């Protein structure tokens, strides 16, 4: 409820008036006529008529006459009887509110106004009529109806707005569906175009690759045709060079190694001659003679010296003869190698590379045989060359066939004899 309705109900309770209906009449009695008004008339059927049930016709506002003007001077009266009517101006300034009419009692006029009684009631109470203007006839029912109307209008507006929103959403959904269909169609078209482009590109690549392969094959064939004579010439040239180098290197390798061997042999021979002739010994040590050796034992005991009671001249002469024989052998072998070298050169000029290899093998065999001869001559492995004159005083054999040598230390002290067994 509104505050206005509460105010209306409160005033109705105070005045004992029901303002829910508009066509109601209120009879207000004066104090003098209170007794008369208390006695309510009874209907023939025995029902008591209350004040609230007494109705008055609704008056419409009319234009006031000059006589009804409130500022008119009533002292200068005429012969006409003055009839006083309840005016709106007399009650409007006594109201508490502009919207709620207030009923106030009115004293009777001395001039004897004519009162109208509703239904011919004999009571002398003053009847106050309620104003029936549109502004003052506001009631609780009208406020309730207005509130209901306002809520109904609001609900209708909300309903209409919701329906419009739903329609707009449907329209948008349809538009989006159409857009999706268009996008799908465009996508399918693009996919087809892409497939076509791929097929075109693959075909172009295959054609280009085939052309490139053909061009490469043609270029390779042309290069082979151009390079075949050059390659043949180069191969022939390399073969010639290899043959020349093989002959040169073969001869150089064949004759460089024997020369080195010859130098080594020469040094070994000189060393052995010096040891055999005792060029490094002093005259006092000439008594100490080297013991002759037999095989490898002679090499180990070459540094051992032993005294000899009798120094035969045949030993020195045999040693000198052996050295001369060795020198003669070396000279003969060198001559043979030089002859072989000359023959090898002639064969290189006349024969092919196969003959050169055979000659090289033969030369190597000759050189190794010469090396073996020199070795046997230097080390004295052959025992047939030994003569019975090369016996040493003091040498003897045991029962087991082992030779025993008596040697002395190389000192100026008296000779100390020591026994060595072999």
From Swiss-Prot:
One of its GO terms (cellular component) is cytoplasm. Residues 155-208 form a coiled coil. Residues 65-75, 233-243, 400-422 have a biased composition (Basic and acidic residues). Pfam families: TDA11. Residues 114-130 have a biased composition (Polar residues). It comes from Zygosaccharomyces rouxii (strain ATCC 2623 / CBS 732 / NBRC 1130 / NCYC 568 / NRRL Y-229). Belongs to the TDA11 family. Residues 29-45, 131-148, 210-226, 314-341, 348-366 have a biased composition (Low complexity). InterPro entries: Tda11 (IPR031388). Keywords: Coiled coil, Cytoplasm. Residues 15-148, 203-255, 309-368, 382-422 are annotated as: Disordered. Residues 85-97 have a biased composition (Basic residues). This is Topoisomerase I damage affected protein 11. It is found in: Cytoplasm.
């Amino acid at each position: 409820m509104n505050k206005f309705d509460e105010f209306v109900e409160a005033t109705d309770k105070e005045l004992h008036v029901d303002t829910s209906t508009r066509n109601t009449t209120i009879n207000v009695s004066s104090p003098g006529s209170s007794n008369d008004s208390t006695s309510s008339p009874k209907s023939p059927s025995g029902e008591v008529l209350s004040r609230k049930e007494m109705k008055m016709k609704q008056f419409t506002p009319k234009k006031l006459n000059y006589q009804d003007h409130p500022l008119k001077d009533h002292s200068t009266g005429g012969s006409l009887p003055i009839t006083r009517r309840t005016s709106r101006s007399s009650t409007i300034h006594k109201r508490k509110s502009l919207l709620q009419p207030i009923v106030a009692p009115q004293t009777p006029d001395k001039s004897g106004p004519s009162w109208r009684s509703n239904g011919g009631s004999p009571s002398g109470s003053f009847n106050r009529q309620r104003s029936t203007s549109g502004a003052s006839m506001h009631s609780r029912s009208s406020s309730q109806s207005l509130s209901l109307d306002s809520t109904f209008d609001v609900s209708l507006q909300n309903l209409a707005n919701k329906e419009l929103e739903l329609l707009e959403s449907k329209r948008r959904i349809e538009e989006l569906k159409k857009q999706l269909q268009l996008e799908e169609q465009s996508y399918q078209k693009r996919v087809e175009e892409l497939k076509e482009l791929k097929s075109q590109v693959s075909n172009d690549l295959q054609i280009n690759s085939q052309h490139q392969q053909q061009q490469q094959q043609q270029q390779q064939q042309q290069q082979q045709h151009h390079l075949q004579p050059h390659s043949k010439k180069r191969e022939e040239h390399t073969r010639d060079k290899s043959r020349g180098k093989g002959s040169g290197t073969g001869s150089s390798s064949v004759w460089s190694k024997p020369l080195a061997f010859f130098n080594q042999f020469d040094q070994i021979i000189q060393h052995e001659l010096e040891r055999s002739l005792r060029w490094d010994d002093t005259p006092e040590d000439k008594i100490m003679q080297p013991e002759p050796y037999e095989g490898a034992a002679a090499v180990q005991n070459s540094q051992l010296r032993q005294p000899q009671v009798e120094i035969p001249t045949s030993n020195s002469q045999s040693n000198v003869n052996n050295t001369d024989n060795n020198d003669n052998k070396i000279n003969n072998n060198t001559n043979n190698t030089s002859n072989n070298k000359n023959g090898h050169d002639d064969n290189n000029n006349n024969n092919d590379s196969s003959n050169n290899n055979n000659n090289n093998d033969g030369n190597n065999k000759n050189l190794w045989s010469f090396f073996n001869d020199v070795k046997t001559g230097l080390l004295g492995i052959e025992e047939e060359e030994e003569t019975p004159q090369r016996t040493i005083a003091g040498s003897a054999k045991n029962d087991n066939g082992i030779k025993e040598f008596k040697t002395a230390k190389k000192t100026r002290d008296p000779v100390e004899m020591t026994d060595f067994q072999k």
